[in-house]
């Protein structure tokens, strides 16, 4: 497996770039966010990569960070989601935003991505929702989680929801949610359709 590439950018296309390393130009498909961040033609770049071996092709995919690559691997593991659809989804936002959409069951947001219809979006949510730990995302690291939200998580878990479901409900709270535990609990239960 080729885990990473360092080399000189030879060209940048709509969905790919060519990186020369060791005298060989490698065609690497990448999400738009990665293509926008790699630099200019002629500059050195570093990409985390994933090599997909098929019967008729060896295809290399590049990412700006390991989180993108890991999410890509999860996405292509979903039935009906190939590399092209996974790249389209990764091009629609940061890995954290996409994972929050999946954990929160935001089918409408996922279905807006080219190549993903409502059924595919539902399948992505169904297959990946339980695999995403929102507490590990950059915007919701334990240091950024308020005491109030920790208490709310504990209450939701005691009511029978999983830690992932509780984190998804808290992530779905509006930014201007009331600062009282009771109101936040009411909003979180409404997220589950229980209130």
Swiss-Prot record:
Annotated spans, Domain III: 151-195
Keyword line: Cytoplasm, DNA damage, DNA recombination, DNA repair, DNA-binding
Gene3D superfamilies hit by this protein: 5' to 3' exonuclease, C-terminal subdomain, DNA helicase RuvA subunit, C-terminal domain, Nucleic acid-binding proteins
Disulfides per UniProt: none
InterPro entries: DNA_helicase_Holl-junc_RuvA_I, Hlx-hairpin-Hlx_DNA-bd_motif, NA-bd_OB-fold, RuvA, RuvA_2-like, RuvA_C, RuvA_C_sf
SMART domains given in the database record: HhH1
Signal peptide bounds: none
One CC-aspect GO term: cytoplasm
A GO molecular function held by the record: ATP binding
Region (Flexible linker): 143-151
Pfam families, alphabetized: HHH_5 (PF14520), RuvA_C (PF07499), RuvA_N (PF01330)
One Gene Ontology term from the biological process aspect of the record: DNA repair
Domain of life from the UniProt record: Bacteria
Main location: cytoplasm
Entry keyword Cytoplasm: yes
Record has DNA repair as a keyword: yes
Region (Domain II): 65-142
Compartments, record wording: Cytoplasm
HAMAP family membership: DNA_HJ_migration_RuvA
NCBIfam families according to UniProt: ruvA
Main function: The RuvA-RuvB-RuvC complex processes Holliday junction (HJ) DNA during genetic recombination and DNA repair, while the RuvA-RuvB complex plays an important role in the rescue of blocked DNA replication forks via replication fork reversal (RFR). RuvA specifically binds to HJ cruciform DNA, conferring on it an open structure. The RuvB hexamer acts as an ATP-dependent pump, pulling dsDNA into and through the RuvAB complex. HJ branch migration allows RuvC to scan DNA until it finds its consensus sequence, where it cleaves and resolves the cruciform DNA.
Family membership noted in the UniProt record: Belongs to the RuvA family.
Domain notes: Has three domains with a flexible linker between the domains II and III and assumes an 'L' shape. Domain III is highly mobile and contacts RuvB.
Subunit details: Homotetramer. Forms an RuvA(8)-RuvB(12)-Holliday junction (HJ) complex. HJ DNA is sandwiched between 2 RuvA tetramers; dsDNA enters through RuvA and exits via RuvB. An RuvB hexamer assembles on each DNA strand where it exits the tetramer. Each RuvB hexamer is contacted by two RuvA subunits (via domain III) on 2 adjacent RuvB subunits; this complex drives branch migration. In the full resolvosome a probable DNA-RuvA(4)-RuvB(12)-RuvC(2) complex forms which resolves the HJ.
Entry protein name: Holliday junction branch migration complex subunit RuvA
Organism: Chloroflexus aurantiacus (strain ATCC 29366 / DSM 635 / J-10-fl)
Lineage: Bacteria, Bacillati, Chloroflexota, Chloroflexia, Chloroflexales
């Amino acid at each position: 497996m080729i885990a990473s590439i360092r080399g000189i950018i030879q060209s940048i296309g709509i969905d790919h770039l060519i990186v020369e390393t060791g005298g060989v130009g490698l065609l690497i498909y990448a999400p738009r966010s990665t293509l926008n961040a790699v630099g200019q033609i002629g500059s050195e770049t570093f990409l985390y990569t994933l090599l997909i071996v098929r019967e008729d092709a060896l295809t290399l995919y590049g990412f700006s960070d390991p989180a993108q690559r890991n999410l890509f691997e999860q996405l292509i593991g979903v039935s009906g989601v190939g590399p092209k659809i996974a790249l389209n989804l990764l091009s629609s936002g940061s890995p954290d935003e996409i994972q929050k959409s999946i954990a929160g069951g935001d089918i409408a947001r996922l279905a807006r991505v080219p190549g993903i219809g409502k059924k595919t979006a539902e399948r992505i949510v169904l297959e990946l929702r339980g695999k995403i730990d929102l507490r590990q995302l950059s915007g919701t690291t334990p240091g950024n989680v308020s005491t109030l939200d920790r208490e709310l998580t504990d209450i939701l878990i005691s009511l029978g929801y999983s830690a992932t479901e509780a984190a998804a409900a808290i992530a779905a709270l509006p930014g201007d949610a009331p600062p009282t535990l009771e109101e936040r609990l009411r909003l979180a239960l409404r997220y589950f359709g229980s209130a």
